[in-house]
Amino acid sequence: MTVMSLTATLMAAKKAKGMSFADLEAAIGLDEVWVASLFYGQATASKEEAEKLAGLLSLDAETTAALQEYPTKGSLEPVIPTDPLIYRFYEIMQVYGMPLKDVIQEHFGDGIMSAIDFTIDVDKVEDPKGDRVKIVMCGKFLPYKKW
């Protein structure tokens, strides 16, 4: 099963059941962003997690098995995103990527922020001038090793 067909199958099942990613988070105990990443072929479910989702969404055996495969992460096309919301993240990194890198290295030293030992939370912040999106990323700092 391709990532595109897996995503289409999962999204159709979620829609048919009238569920949101927040509903799935509550039902299986995994964060809604992580569940969404699973739907887009960017995460791997354990057998138990895949079976819970299969029960909730009435998934067949092939789809349930595909949820447990190890994905090729970060393989979304095209390289420069064209979806307006996703492009904003690309634009944010174009504008703030180097400044963030410098500030992080001033605080922690030479290294990177893990996207493996990592969480991301999305919240809605009510504002009279227009609601705001609040995204909090929390990744373990990994210093570069000298040898």
Swiss-Prot record:
GO BP terms: cyanate metabolic process
Catalytic activity reported:
cyanate + hydrogencarbonate + 3 H(+) = NH4(+) + 2 CO2
Task: State the source organism's domain of life.
Answer: Bacteria
Q: Which SUPFAM superfamilies match?
A: Cyanase C-terminal domain, lambda repressor-like DNA-binding domains
Active-site annotation? 88, 91, 114
What CDD domains has UniProt attached to this entry? Cyanase_C, HTH_XRE
Q: Which HAMAP family match?
A: Cyanate_hydrat
This molecule's function is given as: Catalyzes the reaction of cyanate with bicarbonate to produce ammonia and carbon dioxide.
The protein here is known as Cyanate hydratase
- Annotated organism of origin: Parasynechococcus marenigrum (strain WH8102)
